From Swiss-Prot:
Name this polypeptide is given: Small ribosomal subunit protein bS21
Alphabetically ordered keywords of this record: Ribonucleoprotein, Ribosomal protein
InterPro entries reported in the protein's UniProt record: Ribosomal_bS21, Ribosomal_bS21_CS, Ribosomal_bS21_sf
Composition bias type Basic residues, residue spans: 43-58
Pfam families per UniProt: Ribosomal_S21 (PF01165)
Membership in a protein family: Belongs to the bacterial ribosomal protein bS21 family.
Keyword Ribonucleoprotein: yes
Compositionally skewed regions (Basic and acidic residues) per UniProt: 32-42
GO cellular component: ribonucleoprotein complex; ribosome
Any Gene Ontology biological process: translation
Gene coding for it: rpsU
UniProt-listed NCBIfam families: S21p (TIGR00030)
Stretches for region Disordered: 32-58
Entry keyword annotation includes Lipid biosynthesis: no
């Protein structure tokens, strides 16, 4: 969980911007998208091997 403590004399916009940046660094949005739908283990393995093949030929 990302926490942001609003500093004294800090605008809400800048605090929200810091919070969004922390969430992006933590990978929360990607994790939510990944877990949105169930993915069978065989499909996970297939995607993983395709990604490895793609990296190898790049």
């Amino acid at each position: 969980m990302s926490n942001v403590i609003v500093k004294e004399n800090e605008s809400l916009d800048s605090a929200l911007r810091r919070f969004k940046r922390n969430c992006a660094k933590a990978g929360i949005q990607q994790e939510i998208r990944k877990r949105e739908h169930y993915e069978k283990p065989s499909v996970k393995r297939k995607k993983k091997s395709e990604a490895a093949r793609k990296r190898k030929f790049k």
